[in-house]
Amino acid sequence: MERQGLDLGLSLGLGLTTAATWPAAGFCLNSGMAEQEVIRRDDVVAATAAEDERFACSPGSPVSSGSGKRGSGSGSGDEVDDAGCDVGGGGARKKLRLSKDQAAVLEECFKTHHTLTPKQKVALAKSLNLRPRQVEVWFQNRRARTKLKQTEVDCEHLKRWCDQLADDNRRLHKELAELRALKATPTPPAAAPPLTTLTMCLSCKRVANAGVPSPAAAIFPGHPQFLCGFRDHAGAASSSYGGASSGLAKAVRAAR
C-alpha cells in the first residue's frame, strides 16, 4: 500500500514536473524560431536592397526613368541623359549630345508617334546608334516640352478672353447705371399744342383761318392779296369791256 502510494506520488510529481517544464521548453523553442526568423528576414531585406540597387542602376529601370524625367525638364532637345549609376552612390550623370541627323530623325518619328512601343524603341535606337534608354528619355523630354508650350498657349488665350469679359462687364455696368439714371429723372410735362394763327385779307376785309384754307388759298396759299386784287381787277375789266361792247352795239344800230 505504501509502495503504491509512493509510486503514485512519484508519477504525480513527474507529471507536474513535466507539465511545469513544457512552457519553458516551448518558450525556448519559440525564442529560437523567432531569432532564426529575424535573421532570415534580415537576410531577405539585405538581398532585396541589393537587388533594388542593381535594378535602379540598370538603363531600362523605372527608377532611372523617373530620375531621367526629373532631370529632363532643364535639358535641351538635342541632349539626353546618359544614365550611369554607381552602386556606392558616387556615379555622376552625363548628357549625350545628339547630332543634327539624329535629332531630325527623332523629330520626324515624334510627329508620327508621340509614344513608342518597345520594338519601335529598339529599332529606332539601333538605326541611330543609340541605346533604347536614350531614345526613351528624348521622347519624354519632347512630350514635356510640347505639353508646356500648349499650356502657355492656352494660358495666353484664357488671359485674352478674361480681359475681353472684363471689358464687356464694365460696359454693361455703365449702361445699367445710365438706364437707372434715366429712370430716376422726372419726365417733363407734355408740350401744349400751338395756337391757331389768324390772317387778315386786306382786299376782302375778311378774317380767314390759317388752319382751314379757303379754296382760293388752297390753290395759291401764299398770295391771298394777289387773288383778291386779281378778282377785283378782273371784275373791273369785265365791266369796262362789257360797257364798251354795249356802246359799240348801240352805234351799229344807229348807223343802220
Curated annotation (Swiss-Prot):
Transmembrane segments: none
DNA-binding region: 91-150
InterPro entries in alphabetical order: HD, HD-ZIP_Homeobox_LZ_Class_II, Homeobox_CS, Homeodomain-like_sf, Leu_zip_homeo
Region (Leucine-zipper): 149-193
Disulfide bonds: none
GO cellular component, one term: nucleus
A Pfam family that the UniProt record links to this protein: HALZ
Tissue distribution of the protein: Expressed in seedlings, roots, stems and panicles.
Protein name, per record: Homeobox-leucine zipper protein HOX28
